[in-house]
From Swiss-Prot:
A lipid is attached at residue 509 (S-farnesyl cysteine). This is Chitin synthase regulatory factor 2. It is found in: Membrane. The modification Cysteine methyl ester is found at residue 509. The lineage of its organism: Eukaryota, Fungi, Dikarya, Ascomycota, Taphrinomycotina.
Amino acid sequence: MLVSNGGTGSAHEWDRTTIDYDIEPSSDTHAIEISSNDDYLHPLAQFKKSEEFDEVPTNTLIHEVPSFSDSASNIQSQRNLSPFKELEIVSKKKSEQTFSSAVDFSAINVKNLNLKSGLFDPEPPSYDPDYAFNQRSLQSDPGSDEMFRNFKKSISLEELKSSYKLASAEMCEPETRLSFLQLALQAEKSSSRRNREYVARKKEEAFDYLTSFVSQGNSFFGYSEALYLLAVCYGTGALRTEINEKEAYRLYKMAADLNHVQAAYRVAICLQMGFGVTQNTEEAIHYFFRAASGQHVGAMHRMALIYFRGLMSVKRDPVKAMYYLNLGALEADHEFPQALYDLAELYEHGSSYLDGLLELSPRKAFVLYHIAAKYGLKDAQLRVARCFELGQLECDINLVRSFVWYRRLARKRNPEAMWKLSQFYLNGVDDVIYPNPELANEWAKAAAYKNHHLASTFVQDVGKEDVFEKTSITISNEERKSRNSESLPKKKKRLSMLSFKRSKNRESCIIS
């Protein structure tokens, strides 16, 4: 858990912070299994690039969040107001050097970060945005396989059947059936084959529920949600629906006009990318702003990118950009963690170009990288692994933790992580991971298959000569077999001696 002393303003005294990993021995000597709260981690979607934003495919999903400001309804009622004039509501005084009058950071929910509101400095940035936001960090808002952020991470088949039983009753409330439809759409995207097969058997009935809800008009509370779910079906092919981008956009637009936050974000994406409608960047900004006003994390991050780089014919404004980036970082979660990563880059590079309003802070950068890594962002996981490996960002070197992060990322087929994991297996990690040249070669081949240059060279050298004989860490096959045959109690005892037993595994990394 990351803890601060709750200071306010831009000057903080950070307490000593501990980052916990419960490392348990595995039956495989060359692997460390961790027991943590990272079960929800999943590979993030990687999208292709476009001219102004990373391209978002039509099946990108958006997520409902509650409104945090009464200003959202006021803004939405001002239909004749230009989007550029609307944006002036966010920052009334462009020349202000602080956001204290624009937003009350103490009132923002920071439960996702387990931090008090004093973490993020609310001063405007002073740096070259083109330097801080490199091409890698300008990737699209990462999505997940989950449809709605307020859903559980997984659904059991029994829960799905129980929900259907309630929804199929004759005197069923519309909200009950709507809840089943939400679960069905999520289960269809899950990794459980039984869940997918069950939804496939009920897809026609579920689609009939949706169409009946929409045909009733705005006569029940969940009408906007039903419109959105039906739009998801037409836009992504859910419930085996034939994809129809024009119909999906029409339904998204109807839901957005009823103040549905995710639908507003989806309409903005459609207008920006031209999915089912003619491209209209001015209207896209209007809907991005509406979604951001409804506290949609992805929309807040998009607005930050627009102002940082001056995209879509909008004048570059670092003050407004930093406002949205701070909000996006405060509300970031496992579906939209990118704002954390971008803010970490700013703290890592510091204000090298203007008045020094955003000071260099490696400690805060590491905290933000680590939170984004816990949320599953691949770039952040790679950065955290390097920090533990090389002692960067004022972090103590810890090869075991570095190995854990590299291995987690290597399982997602990241070539750099696979190459690093190969080096760890080649050289070993203290007395926890024994050298294993064969396994090192396998991971190097996997990285080479992904066109990693160093891994390709390494594999070619292995084919020409016995590289492993030149290393000082090579162990004999007999010794390796002897180590692999250690009983589980012996492994636990060995890990305990190295202070990696569950009850004692609380190594500290000073971040202040």
